[in-house]
Amino acid sequence: MHPPAPALLIINGKGAGNEEVRLAVQKLRDENQTLHVRVTWEQGDAARYVQEACQLGVATLIAGGGDGTINEVAAALAALPAKGRPVLGILPLGTANDFAMACNIPLIPEQALRLAVKGRAVPIDLAKVNDQRYFINMATGGFGTRITTETPEKLKAALGGVSYFIHGLLRMDTLKADRCEIRGPDFHWSGDALVIGIGNGKQAGGGQQLCPDALINDGLLQLRLLTADELLPTLIASLFNDEENKNVIGAALPWLEIDAPHEMTFNLDGEPLKGRHFRIEVLPNAIECRLPPNCELLGQTQSSQ
């Protein structure tokens, strides 16, 4: 019987003291799993550890953290040549863990680590923005972006994903639309947008399904935007139910361009990017990721195999 293929865990510094993670790592090592561990301290560390992982010849690179950590590791993997590229594994340790939750990845560290090293590897899409930045889960613009950026760390630590919603309710007085124009294949819209979601994954902001039809292996991004032609009570209802609403506009596109007369901010898996022009395109089958059989972000082709 062959020994398990080696893996490297890149863990966000905030989770380095997690006792459950330490015990899970030790348990796998006791089962002869070669598992290297590296801890990030500042921006760019994850990318450097990805290069080290290639030198070590690991089969799996595990991102231990929230959506931002997964983003950084996935982006560094996408920049590698396909031949010999490690598979992405995920250990959810963030505040909301939106991508992991939508994939049905276990939140218990030992279960997540076992999936990350032994699970089925499937090709998944990534999205690229302005030919320089990536996202694996979602890009959000408008009011929702300001809320996730401004939610205090102490509130996030105490309440988790629901903190975004609570902070949003407290900041409704600052509700302001972004005027912009959005174009894509057979799609054109211009006007004032309160919330813009461009999903490779389904949910953001602590479990809110902003792009409920998105899949990570269909070669498309789901655009969903909420226009400003809306009264506040109806706006809140529109964000949290599936009822038809003429002010909720959606499309499935392989690429789209957004232009604004003023500077806008988009959150790419929680990391801000400012600008007046954004070109966002899907990269089909960009990397491989170890996912559970019941992953709800995979289309029928993959999930039924």
Swiss-Prot record:
EC nos: 2.7.1.-
Signal peptide segment: none
Entry-linked InterPro entries: ATP-NAD_kinase_N, Diacylglycerol/lipid_kinase, Diacylglycerol_kinase_cat_dom, Lip_kinase_YegS, Lipid_Phosphate_FormReg, NAD/diacylglycerol_kinase_sf, YegS/DAGK_C
Cofactor annotation remark: Binds 1 Mg(2+) ion per subunit. Ca(2+) may be able to substitute.
Cellular localisation: Cytoplasm
GO-annotated molecular function: ATP binding; lipid kinase activity; magnesium ion binding
Main localization, broad class: cytoplasm
Enzyme class, first EC level, given as a word: transferase
Entry-linked PROSITE patterns: DAGK
Chain positions recorded as ATP binding sites: T40, G66, D67, G68, T69, I70, N71, E72, T95
Cofactor(s) listed in the protein's UniProt record: Mg(2+); Ca(2+)
Keywords: ATP-binding, Cytoplasm, Kinase, Lipid biosynthesis, Lipid metabolism, Magnesium, Metal-binding, Nucleotide-binding, Phospholipid biosynthesis, Phospholipid metabolism, Transferase
Residues where Mg(2+) binds: L215, D218, L220
UniProt domain DAGKc: residue ranges: 2-134
Gene Ontology CC annotations of this record: cytoplasm; plasma membrane
Superkingdom to which the source organism belongs: Bacteria
A Pfam family the protein falls into: DAGK_cat
GO BP term (any one): phospholipid biosynthetic process
Positions of the catalytic residues: E271 (proton acceptor)
UniProt-listed HAMAP family: YegS (MF_01377)
UniProt record similarity statement: Belongs to the diacylglycerol/lipid kinase family. YegS lipid kinase subfamily.
Function of the molecule: Probably phosphorylates lipids; the in vivo substrate is unknown.
Name of the protein in its database record: Probable lipid kinase YegS-like
Source species: Serratia proteamaculans (strain 568)
